[in-house]
Amino acid sequence: MIMSQLLNYVAVLFFCVSRASSLDTFIAAVYEHAVILPNATLVPVSPEEALAVMNRNLDLLEGAVTSASKQGAHIIVTPEDGIYGFNFTRESIYPYLEDIPDPQVNWIPCNNPDRFGHTPVQQRLSCLAKDNSIYIVANIGDKKSCNASDPQCPPDGRYQYNTDVVFDSKGKLVARYHKQNLFLNEDQFNAPKEPEVVTFNTTFGKFGIFTCFDILFHDPAVTLVRDSHVDTILFPTAWMNVLPHLSAIEFHSAWAMGMRVNFLASNLHYPLKKMTGSGIYAPDSPRAFHYDMKTEEGKLLLAQLDSHPHPTPVVNWTSYASGVEAHSVGNQEFTGIIFFDEFTFLELKEIGGNYTVCQRDLCCHLSYKMSEKRSDEVYALGAFDGLHTVEGSYYLQICTLLKCKTTDLHTCGDSVETASTRFEMFSLSGTFGTQYVFPEVLLSEIQLAPGEFQVSNDGRLFSLKPTSGPVLTVTLFGRLYEKDSAPNTLSDLTTQALRLNPKTDAWKSK
């Protein structure tokens, strides 16, 4: 009896201590970093020159880390390519790389910097985390030697990886992730042989990490949420904005809502390549975001998040739409191009009404009312159901309400940043063949609309109030991962299309 009581006491004590040491909320920070680039050269520089460039960027990151820590942040995310920039060859990136060990080695570089060779960048990041008692997420390059015993070993005898690292508040390396889905011009890096699903636990939730282009694919992004059940995604990125559907703050906030997870996105700040857009996103609404194409300055964002976001019911994305009768009100369909994909459109000719447009298996239904019907602005409802083959190969189903660039219907789908028409209400749904649908609402001047819309359990994206600003787009962006072509295999249409239409911007650049 005494032993049983003692065990019960110990169990209760352990539960109380564990609850006391865990946090219901935490303060997240992301830093949009105005990266300092090395001199443009394809010739490898000396290790000393490479370290000098990296230290200049680390000086700026140090200021952001220190400021975030003083404001109570528990974790800070910094961007992809934030320490050395971009536009490298396989040879010219090499002086910037370090050997990054498996975190299972239990290593604090600040205390033991030479344990794995010359690792000055890891040492500095570790000391920054330790000195400021904060988790730091950074993106650097990893190098791993190989030989002929490995049939996949590159000719130069090494693997080079685009790598995210995480140091905890004591400076310990707790996570290392090698980017799986490399973008077209990331020839300086290798993809890992298998997707890495990287997680770590803290007193303020379970975290997963992936990088930039990974967000468009199932592995490891969806796996982290669906199978590993992380609370928060860490997302270093070097994202080039492409409207109307792939601006950074628009798509990243939509992914957080669609996957029902916290999402910390840190982008490079480099307006010359349309790189801007960072945010702290909760499943229900953005907590903080930044988009700035006008200045050349970085930006630190902080916001409070729930450590364990409240679970929400799974959305049946086709439930409502499958029971709606088509409403075309006599309008004629026309086609338009969005990022090389041919959409089927209907012009919204009235101040309000109900419209339906279909393509293949996808029918999109819209109910709406504008605040006024302007003669100088045209809006359209569009549908796309097909395989996207430019700068990656991935299957999409998209329903979108968008503003056309001009009153010429041929401009529907072109990039637009400003509008004048507000909407009193909207409700958008579609007969999606996937559970992976990401809801986007983007307002004039590239602004989000936190708290102004919601997704119902039956798959409707609808407004809660009149929009606070003019509307650029209201979109349901669906991904059918099972219909993707083979990984890392791009259609010949990619090169052909880029040659035929060189004015079209890539959505992500290295």
UniProtKB/Swiss-Prot annotation:
Membrane-topology descriptor = Lipid-anchor; GPI-anchor
UniProtKB keywords = Cell membrane, Glycoprotein, GPI-anchor, Hydrolase, Lipoprotein, Membrane, Signal
Query: Which region is the signal sequence?
Result: 1-22
Q: Name one GO cellular component term.
A: plasma membrane
Lipidated sites in chain (GPI-anchor amidated aspartate): D492
Q: Which domain of life is it from?
A: Eukaryota
Top EC class per UniProt? hydrolase
Q: Where found in the cell?
A: Cell membrane
What biological-process GO terms show up in the record? pantothenate metabolic process
Tell me the active site.
E80, K179, C212
Please describe the quaternary structure of this protein: Monomer.
Name of this chain's protein: Pantetheinase
Q: Which organism is it from?
A: Bos taurus (Bovine)
